[in-house]
Amino acid sequence: MLRMNSVRKKRTDKTVVKEHIVLAAAKSFAQKGVKTVRMDDIAAGLSISKRTLYELFHDKEDLLLDVMKLHREEMQEYMTQVASKAENVLEVLLKFFQRSAQDFQNTNRKFFEDIEKYPKVMRYIDESRKENLDSAIMGHRTKRILRIERKEYQTY
């Protein structure tokens, strides 16, 4: 029983460390670009060893991919909230583009130039954009259909 608890604790600790690394990397990448930020800088900034960093992330591209996944999760949460309150699809699209523009303004342009050198990351970004927009639009359509059905039901 003790072994199982210690295994769970290790997994939890690793997960927490990984999350801290991803958040720190996201901040550094956004401020300075990807190329300028070295794995050494991230490890030193978090007071962890490079070994720990490389045990969790094979290379900088893996770390960058996790940063992009975090951003996608945040965007999905935002779009879900927007879609649930929006009156029409145009409002959803407008909010999406406003948020994207805000993210763009808060990110060093070098970041966008640098990520083009990471093919896995670029594929992930393209897929994410399509899925985020599709899910937001579908969420709004579903909401609209439910409203129509409710009105029809209330009529009877």
PLM feature segments, named:
Residues M1-K32, T36-G45, D62-L65:
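Basic, helix-initiating cap at the start of DNA-binding domains
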Residues R8-T12, V16, H58, D62, ...:
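Residues at secondary-structure transition points
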Residues S47-F57:
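Short hydrophobic/aromatic patch on the recognition helix
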Residues D66, E77-N106:
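Hydrophobic alpha-helical connector segments
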Residues A24-Q31, E74-K85:
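Solvent-exposed, amphipathic alpha-helical segments
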Residues Q31-V34, E55, S84, R150:
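Helix-turn-helix/winged-helix DNA-binding modules
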Residues A101-I145, E149-T155:
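Short secondary-structure transition hinges
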